[in-house]
């Protein structure tokens, strides 16, 4: 493009002919004369949709934007999405790396082969616009990446943890294992006893081994990047509404790369597996 502009500049000032300018500057005359065809209305609409989705989801890369377009019925290549995003300056900045925690295990699950085989839970913190602390308990099914619950409180005690787990079990079934760090809420005797009575085994990650709890760490990174860092949370009530909306979006609308760019809900529906599968011990 710069060489074409140089040829146009030289010819425009009458310094030499097009033929000579192209020869000196190494530009083929057909290349110089080429003018891009105007985009068809459908292509313009597609371009605008790519830009709109990229602005709507600023932390989504080109693969996830392409998956969203496919959900809407658009047929678009990877390079086309990359080209438009590069032209519009919509490149996603690298995400910051996350750090996790750890805990005495009664089971040793590795990778969940089905829903409700392994759940994982942890805490994440944030602040309201006025500086008040928000403590959030997050709960995830490792197989489907489905977020089962995000409980938002000022403080979370063992009773809150048990009630949130009980609520998730009433709607999603009973997990065989729960993976977590060694947080005081998770190793509390009350929780240990309750889990044992319900035949739920525990898997505590080793100290300083965040990769052992990679699912929840990845979820927290996404949760902070796409929700907490973008929203002004005025108070606890608003935080609960905003975060629950995001949780539903993550489960029902957001394409997940590890699920073949399906949403967790669609992925589970495609498996044709009952949510009670984890109860078959």
Q: Could you describe each region identified by the protein language model?
A:
Residues 1-281:
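Charged DNA-binding/catalytic regions of mobile-element recombinases
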């Amino acid at each position: 493009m710069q060489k074409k502009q140089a040829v146009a500049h030289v010819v425009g000032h009458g310094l030499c002919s097009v033929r000579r300018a192209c020869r000196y500057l190494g530009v083929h005359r057909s290349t110089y004369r080429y003018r891009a065809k105007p985009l068809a209305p459908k292509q313009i609409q597609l371009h605008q949709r790519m830009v709109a989705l990229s602005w709507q989801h600023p932390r989504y890369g080109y693969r996830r934007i392409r998956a969203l377009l496919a959900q809407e019925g658009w047929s678009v290549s990877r390079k086309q999405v990359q080209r438009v995003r590069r032209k519009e300056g919509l490149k996603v900045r690298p995400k910051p790396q996350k750090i996790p925690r750890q805990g005495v295990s009664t089971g040793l699950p590795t990778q969940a082969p089905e829903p409700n085989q392994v759940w994982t839970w942890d805490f994440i913190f944030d602040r309201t616009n006025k500086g008040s602390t928000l403590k959030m308990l997050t709960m995830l099914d490792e197989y489907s990446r489905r977020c089962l619950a995000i409980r938002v409180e000022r403080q979370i005690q063992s009773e809150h943890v048990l009630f949130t787990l009980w609520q998730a079990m009433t709607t999603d079934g009973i997990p065989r294992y729960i993976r977590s760090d060694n947080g005081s809420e998770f190793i509390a005797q009350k929780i240990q006893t309750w889990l044992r009575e319900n035949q739920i085994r525990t898997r505590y990650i080793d100290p300083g081994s965040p990769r052992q709890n990679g699912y929840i760490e990845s979820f927290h990174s996404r949760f902070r990047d796409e929700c907490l860092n973008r929203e002004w949370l005025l108070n606890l009530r608003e935080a609960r509404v905003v975060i629950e909306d995001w949780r539903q979006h993550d489960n029902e609308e957001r394409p997940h790369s590890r699920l073949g760019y399906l949403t967790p809900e669609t992925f589970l529906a495609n498996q044709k597996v009952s949510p009670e599968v984890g109860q078959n011990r």
